[in-house]
């Protein structure tokens, strides 16, 4: 019996959330409704300008682990934070949420903990300004083989592919998990990330992973086609389990050649 159902690896980002007006966004030069990557000085200026801010541990894979933990599953997260106020907050929040944060905050690091300043407008639109900070340095030295071998599944975040050290960390975690009988997979995260690293993505999926999760745009991007069915078939040829989310069309799952299409129920949002 392994200790963890799922071990994830990804960007450890503190979400800093504040209500804001369109006037404020214009004054601060924030483009409404999109996510932008920003530098340290810009991050500090926006953080200081936020009023009544609320903080939460975030990051794509970390959020998934939080959901799994809420279902009662044992989870752990491989991430990198600095030993600063936000880093200590992040590590504590993950632990209190039921997910083991296996990497202690890094002392004397030259980059601060990653944060995403999220400005929520009255119409519900979110404007995100993300500074990656120390998360961009996550590498194989942060991967504990003993933790990986205690995982039934490891879950990788595609966003880390923009750094060579992130790719190396992926392979390290995947191989350690699979060598102990576990399974490894990835959430592709972003079609533009695939565009930048297509060959590496395909090599990882075919040779190092047991499952892949992506939306229709991400799956199509893997094989540079506008035909989703063609992309799904080709992905299924190199990976035994493919999960494709298709928005209002539902979810398509292909497991060892057998396909199931799961429909969605249409509802009216509570704030519509």
Where in the sequence are the language-model features?
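Glycine-centered short loops/turns at secondary-structure junctions
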Residues: 72, 98, 179-181
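Glycine-rich phosphate/adenosyl-contacting loop at the front of the ribokinase-like
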Residues: 1-78, 88-89, 263, 268-270
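A glycine-rich helix N-cap at a beta->alpha junction
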Residues: 93-110
């Amino acid at each position: 019996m392994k200790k963890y159902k799922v071990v994830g690896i990804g960007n450890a980002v503190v979400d800093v959330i504040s209500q804001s007006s369109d006037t404020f966004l214009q004054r601060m030069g924030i483009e409404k409704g999109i996510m932008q990557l920003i530098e340290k000085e810009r991050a500090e200026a926006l953080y200081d300008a936020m009023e009544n801010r609320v903080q939460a541990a975030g990051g794509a894979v970390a959020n998934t682990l939080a959901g799994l933990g809420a279902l009662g599953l044992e989870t752990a997260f491989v991430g990198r934070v600095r030993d600063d106020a936000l880093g200590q907050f992040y590590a504590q929040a993950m632990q209190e949420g039921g997910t083991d944060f296996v990497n202690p905050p890094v002392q004397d690091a030259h980059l601060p903990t990653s944060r995403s300043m999220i400005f929520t407008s009255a119409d519900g639109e979110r404007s995100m300004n993300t500074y990656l900070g120390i998360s961009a340095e996550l590498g194989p030295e942060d991967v504990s083989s003993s933790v990986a071998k205690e995982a039934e599944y490891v879950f990788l975040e595609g966003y880390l592919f923009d750094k060579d050290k992130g790719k190396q960390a992926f392979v390290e975690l995947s191989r350690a998990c699979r060598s102990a009988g576990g399974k490894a997979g990835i959430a592709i995260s972003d079609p533009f990330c695939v565009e930048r690293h297509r060959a590496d993505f395909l090599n990882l999926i075919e040779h190092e992973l047991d499952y892949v999760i992506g939306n229709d745009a991400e799956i199509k991007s893997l094989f540079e086609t506008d035909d989703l069915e063609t992309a799904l078939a080709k992905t299924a040829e190199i990976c035994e389990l493919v999960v494709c989310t298709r928005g209002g069309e539902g979810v398509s799952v292909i497991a060892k050649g057998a396909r199931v299409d799961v429909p969605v129920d249409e509802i009216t949002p509570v704030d519509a």
